[in-house]
Curated annotation (Swiss-Prot):
Catalytic activity, reaction form: alpha-ribazole + adenosylcob(III)inamide-GDP = adenosylcob(III)alamin + GMP + H(+); alpha-ribazole 5'-phosphate + adenosylcob(III)inamide-GDP = adenosylcob(III)alamin 5'-phosphate + GMP + H(+)
Protein function: Joins adenosylcobinamide-GDP and alpha-ribazole to generate adenosylcobalamin (Ado-cobalamin). Also synthesizes adenosylcobalamin 5'-phosphate from adenosylcobinamide-GDP and alpha-ribazole 5'-phosphate.
Pathway terms, separated by semicolons: Cofactor biosynthesis; adenosylcobalamin biosynthesis; adenosylcobalamin from cob(II)yrinate a,c-diamide: step 7/7
Organism: Halalkalibacterium halodurans (strain ATCC BAA-125 / DSM 18197 / FERM 7344 / JCM 9153 / C-125) (Bacillus halodurans)
Family: Belongs to the CobS family.
One annotated GO molecular function: adenosylcobinamide-GDP ribazoletransferase activity
Record keyword DNA damage present: no
UniProt protein name: Adenosylcobinamide-GDP ribazoletransferase
Length: 261
């Protein structure tokens, strides 16, 4: 129980800006539990997003609501995932060799590719959320809860099936703790997500499409990372959350647009 609680606190310290000042011991068991608890940090974010949406939707336009939801997501993670997105954009779009791309990933400076892709990322997120608010307000409410959970679960999927691009960094430090315990917990999380989707969305085709996409995206992203830099890193994992969110909202928008057309 103690190790589980420590793992939960470590997960929130690492992935969120929730003010946890307590010094948590980093042990093998607490590290494993931390990985298992990643989706819980998404569940809390989902709860905050749903609360904000329900509270302000009677008073604000879809555009302002969408902008506030995106802003809350960024501040909740402290811009951690967005930083990964920017680093990966500069590295992957540089068209350099693998070693140079790894150097660019470690460079704290922001390049032109990072600026351009971040503007596009945030702009398209706001646009898609605004569209979904208008197209399917009921389903959108539940997707706000489910998507952050799925994105953090996809971190576990990448740790299970991927390999580190280098011997240093976040990904390399976490891989030794991806044990059978973590893999079994990942399966339990997927069953929970699947059950919640069927229960809340009440649409079999939508649910099956959603579940298929949250499986395919991390596996596809791992292939991209392997081709570009030989594996994954902390930055690529962060980028997968940002890119994965845009991908899921895009798929959901396409689905509802085709249904209402």
């Amino acid at each position: 129980m103690k190790h589980g609680l420590n793992g939960l606190l470590l997960a929130f310290q690492f992935l969120t800006t929730v003010p946890i000042t307590r010094q948590i011991p980093w042990t093998a068991r607490s590290a494993r539990w931390s990985i298992v608890c990643y989706p819980l940090t998404g569940l809390v974010l989902g709860g905050l997003l749903v609360s904000l949406y329900l509270l302000l939707s009677p008073f604000l336009s879809p555009l302002v609501l969408a902008a506030l939801l995106v802003t809350l997501s960024i501040f909740y993670s402290g811009g951690l995932h967005l930083d990964g997105w920017m680093d990966v954009s500069d590295a992957f779009l540089s068209r350099r060799d693998r070693e140079t791309k790894l150097i660019i990933l470690k460079d704290s400076r922001v390049g032109a590719f990072a600026v351009m892709t971040t503007i596009l990322l945030i702009g398209w997120k706001v646009l898609l959320l605004m569209e979904l608010i208008a197209l399917a307000p009921r389903e959108f409410t539940w997707l706000l809860l489910l998507v952050p959970v799925c994105l953090r679960w996809m971190i576990i999927v990448q740790l299970i099936y991927g390999k580190a691009a280098s011997d240093q960094g976040m990904a390399a430090s976490l891989l030794p703790y991806v044990t059978t315990h973590v893999k079994n917990a990942s399966r339990v999380w997927f069953l929970f997500i699947a059950g919640a989707c069927f229960l809340l969305l009440q649409n079999v085709i939508l649910t099956l499409c959603f579940l298929l996409m949250i499986w395919l995206f991390p596996l596809f992203w791992l292939r991209v990372c392997k081709r570009e830099i030989g594996g994954m890193s902390g930055d690529t994992i962060g980028a997968s959350i940002e890119g994965g969110e845009l991908f899921l909202w895009g798929i959901m928008w396409t689905f509802f647009l085709s249904v209402t057309a």
